[in-house]
Regions:
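Acidic two-metal-ion nuclease catalytic site recognized across multiple nuclease folds
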Residues: 186-198
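Two-metal-ion RNase H-like nuclease active-site motif
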Residues: 1-11, 75
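Residue-level detector of short, conserved catalytic/binding motifs and their immediate flanks
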Residues: 2-4, 15, 70, 180
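Catalytic-loop motifs flanking and including active-site residues across diverse enzymes
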Residues: 13, 81, 178-182
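Short, hydrophobic/amphipathic alpha-helical patches that form generic packing surfaces
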Residues: 161, 181-189
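Coil-to-beta-strand transition motifs
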Residues: 10-14, 26
Length: 198
């Protein structure tokens, strides 16, 4: 089976969806990524278009890996896309309670990575995950204050790293932490399955 996890964006923030699966070798893999950034686009995708994109992404992954879906996760604070998806396809995305402690969410995902049972398939769509993962950091002032907050600033991608996502059929010119958020939601929603909680 495979899982999906969504960090839903708005007018200025990207929507990211990771597809995760357990391999025969016992490793968990990020198989593929849907990524749509509305930045620098005069006409932004509406929730109905994002809903359609995500459903088609799921359908393509199920077909490619010849399997079924176990869990579809989304940020509990996101209502518009969740409602649109249910209205369009009758599927209830599982709202994960991310809580108020971002540090705890990050700890869960770091604990999972520390188990050395997670790998990222090297394909073009997953490059944005790699980029955001390598550049994920706390805001220095927030660390000093004792309440660490991730840096959510949209940063420009270098010209030689122009990113095109085949599932959203669009370019992204900036990156931030969207794939890292959906990864954290996936880990939090699957603690038992991932061997982090018994």
């Amino acid at each position: 089976y495979i899982d999906f996890s969504i960090d839903s964006g708005h007018q200025t923030s990207a929507t990211a969806c990771g597809c995760y699966g357990l391999g025969d070798d016992g490793y968990w893999y990020l198989l593929d990524t849907y990524y749509y950034s509305p930045n620098e686009k005069p006409v932004k995708k509406a929730p109905s278009e994002l809903s359609s994109d995500l459903f088609n992404f799921k359908r393509n992954m199920i077909k490619e890996f010849k399997t079924v879906t176990d869990k579809e996760t989304i940020d509990s604070a996101e209502g518009a896309l969740r409602n649109q998806y249910y209205k369009d396809y009758g599927v209830r995305l599982n709202p994960v309670d991310k809580g108020t402690n971002k540090e705890k969410l990050v700890d869960y995902s770091q604990d999972f990575i520390a188990k050395k049972k997670f790998r990222v398939i090297l394909n073009n769509n997953n490059l944005i995950f790699k980029k955001e993962n390598e550049n994920y950091q706390w805001l220095p002032k927030s660390v000093e204050s004792g309440k660490p907050t991730p840096d959510k600033t949209e940063k420009d991608l270098p010209v030689d790293e122009r990113y095109y996502n085949t599932h959203s059929q669009s370019y992204a010119y900036t990156y931030a932490d969207h794939t890292q958020d959906e990864f954290q939601y996936w880990v939090k929603d699957n603690l038992v399955k991932l061997g982090l909680k018994y």
